[in-house]
């Protein structure tokens, strides 16, 4: 999503960039956006506070056990090192942080754009400011409900001029671990000497709903041998040729899909 604050649409503040000394007598669209953003979340920025926003489906006891088992296998210290973080939200213990990762929607600011962002300073009062945001959804939330909820929430608080532009999005997706598709994946991985760690959901997003949602209602899941990490980061990587016999390279990853298709055909 894009949330856009402009002096022209607001009817206050400048319709073009002006000298910052004039802030003494002219409203700021940038500050207007900051104040609007602040209403969307709790004081610490970690809980969504949008009026009428859909609540996530509670995770089941089976899903909680899956998370607990996975948390025992995955190293918390390694995860923090990989992500370059020192604390989880609210200093949650490892298992509870993973429960939150698997069960809670998010309101994330990807970037803020407005005015001068080059080296040094420039005394300017920007006429427009933009917040790039993403809202991760979890079952049973709907992408179509997000923009109307945000728009109504902002209007109720005097921010009806803020544009809420949806550039893309889709519904959440989930497939049960008991599905034949997932069981076929597990069989192939175990034959390759891998004891898979099972999570109820992928923390990231992909348009799996086109398969798992109406009208198809099919299973969908991620699969493949090989190794990569750092998704969407500057140092994202994937192993093409492996020097570790326990890790497949690109060729081994491709062949794992051949084995997978054979397993599905049984």
Q: Model-found features: residue ranges?
A:
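Active/binding-pocket-proximal capping segment
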Residues: 149-162, 166-170, 204, 226-229
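A short beta-alpha structural unit
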Residues: 135-138, 163-178, 201-203, 207
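Acidic-enriched catalytic cores of C-N bond-cleaving enzymes acting on peptides and small amides
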Residues: 1, 6-112, 141-161
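Zn-dependent metallopeptidase/amidohydrolase metal-coordination segment
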Residues: 4-6, 10-13, 33, 103, ...
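Short, glycine-/Ser/Thr-/acidic-enriched flexible segments
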Residues: 8-10, 114-117, 136-140, 169, ...
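Short, low-order "capping/linker" segments at domain edges
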Residues: 173-191
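Generic hydrophobic alpha-helical scaffold/packing signal
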Residues: 110, 134, 147, 151, ...
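C-terminal catalytic subdomain
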Residues: 114-149
């Amino acid at each position: 999503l894009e949330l856009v604050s402009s002096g022209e649409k607001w009817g206050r503040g400048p319709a073009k960039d002006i000298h910052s000394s004039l802030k003494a007598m002219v409203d700021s669209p940038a500050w207007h956006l900051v104040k609007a953003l602040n209403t969307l979340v709790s004081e610490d920025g970690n809980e969504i506070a949008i009026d009428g926003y859909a609540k996530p489906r509670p995770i089941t006891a089976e899903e909680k056990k899956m998370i607990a088992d996975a948390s025992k296998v995955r190293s918390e210290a390694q995860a923090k090192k990989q992500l370059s973080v020192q604390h989880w939200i609210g200093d949650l213990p490892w298992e509870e942080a993973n429960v939150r990762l698997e069960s809670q929607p998010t309101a994330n600011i990807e970037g803020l754009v407005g005015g001068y962002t080059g080296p040094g300073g420039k005394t300017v009062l920007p006429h427009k400011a933009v917040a790039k945001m993403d809202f991760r959804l979890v079952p049973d939330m709907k992408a179509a409900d997000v923009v109307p909820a945000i728009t109504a929430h902002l209007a109720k608080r005097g921010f009806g001029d803020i544009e809420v532009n949806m550039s893309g999005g889709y519904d959440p997706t989930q497939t049960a671990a008991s599905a034949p598709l997932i069981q076929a994946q597990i069989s192939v991985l175990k034959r390759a000497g891998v004891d898979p760690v099972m999570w109820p959901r992928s923390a990231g997003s992909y348009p799996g709903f086109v398969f798992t949602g109406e009208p198809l209602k099919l299973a969908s899941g991620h699969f493949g041998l090989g190794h990569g990490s750092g998704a969407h980061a500057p140092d994202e990587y994937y192993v093409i040729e492996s020097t570790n016999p326990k890790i497949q390279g690109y060729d081994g990853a491709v062949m794992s899909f051949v084995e997978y298709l054979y397993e599905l055909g049984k």
